[in-house]
Amino acid sequence: PTLVEGQIQGGIAQGLGLALMEEYLPGRTENLHDYLIPTVGDMPEMEIILIEDPDPNGPQGAKGVGEPGLVPTAPAILAAIKSAAGVRIHQIPATPDRVRAAILADGAQGGVMG
């Protein structure tokens, strides 16, 4: 179970990075000093609840568990920003500058936050 939890947490970390941090800019983010990825300090506390149900087609009943943590994380974070700030972010990562720009643009157009 510990390895499975680690796989799920790793997928969530990748989704968090996709939503909030990771952006490849040619010539500017070509190393880990400039290309930001989530670290332990960026991760929220998580409680992973496992439901064991063997896959009859998987080897010894195994299933893949990395993707289920990755796939919904970025959309969930972007939906939370929409709910909290009233603006939709159209380009990821949703950096503070991009969120602020979306709020200001929404206000200039007479939107929810304006």
Model-identified regions with their sequence ranges:
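C-terminal catalytic domains of large/alpha subunits in multi-subunit enzymes
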Residues: P1-G114
